[in-house]
Design a protein with these regions (language model features):
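Enzymes and membrane/adaptor proteins characterized by extended Gly/Ser/Thr/Asp/Glu-rich
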Residues: 1-121, 149-161
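A general structural detector for well-ordered alpha-helical segments in enzyme core domains, enriched
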Residues: 23-27, 80, 125, 129, ...
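Short, well-ordered coil/turn segments that N-cap beta-strands
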Residues: 32-36, 89-90, 134-139, 179-184
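Conserved, mostly hydrophobic/aromatic
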Residues: 41, 84, 129, 143, ...
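Hydrophobic pocket-lining residues that define ligand/cofactor binding sites across diverse proteins
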Residues: 84, 133, 177
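Non-cysteine beta-strand/loop elements that form the S-adenosyl-L-methionine
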Residues: 94-97, 142, 184
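Loop-centered beta-sheet repeat module
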Residues: 119-151
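Flexible, glycine-rich surface segments
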Residues: 145, 152, 161-162, 168-184
Length: 184
């Protein structure tokens, strides 16, 4: 629904919650009864398509959540998930399971998109975030496999090659998260 006019040439079209509810209802109505994923990229922090300026609640970044407990992360994601569900969204491109290997990373570290530099902390908070979304009826999508936390460039602005910076420890959160019961 919302695009940056500099990137896609489309105006921003989210005005408020009621308008988003009408848009998602219209999408479902046009689906001829077929199941439909209505997805958003709502991580919290700086990556939020539903923004406070449009009347939506602000949510902390992964870096902020990572300084707390996994249970607090789950509760935050549950609240976010309930808000998304009310809007008619059922899939969220979150949480980020990137390990903050390179804090100066323009796409991860600088934006506070990683829970931690410790793979076990990332796994614990990522699982808690997914559980909170799932408890609200939202499908969680883990990203950015195989790991974007060591990237020296922003993949939103071009090809990012991590072959020289990537390490095996960046897989750990994915192994933990995907190895849990009920995860695919």
């Amino acid at each position: 629904f919302k695009r940056d006019a500099r990137n896609a040439g489309l105006p921003r079209n989210i005005r408020d919650a009621e308008q988003v509810k009408r848009l998602t209802a219209a999408l479902r109505g046009a689906s001829a009864g077929h199941p439909l994923f209505v997805a958003v990229d709502q991580e919290g922090g700086k990556v939020a398509r539903f923004q406070p300026g449009d009347g939506f609640p602000a949510y902390p970044s992964a870096a902020e959540l990572g300084r707390g407990t996994p249970d607090a992360t789950r509760r935050t994601a549950l609240g976010m998930g309930r808000m998304l569900r009310e809007l008619g969204v059922n899939l969220n491109f979150a949480p980020v399971l990137d390990v903050n290997v390179y804090p100066a990373s323009p796409a991860i570290g600088r934006l506070g998109r990683s829970f931690s530099a410790d793979p076990q902390d990332v796994a614990a908070h990522g699982a808690a975030f997914a559980d909170g979304l799932n408890d609200a009826g939202i499908v969680a999508v883990f990203k950015h496999f195989p790991g974007h936390g060591s990237a020296r460039a922003d993949s939103h602005k071009g090809v990012t090659d991590i072959s020289a910076t990537w390490s095996e420890r960046e897989l750990s959160p994915y192994r933990s998260a995907l190895g849990r019961p009920g995860q695919r």
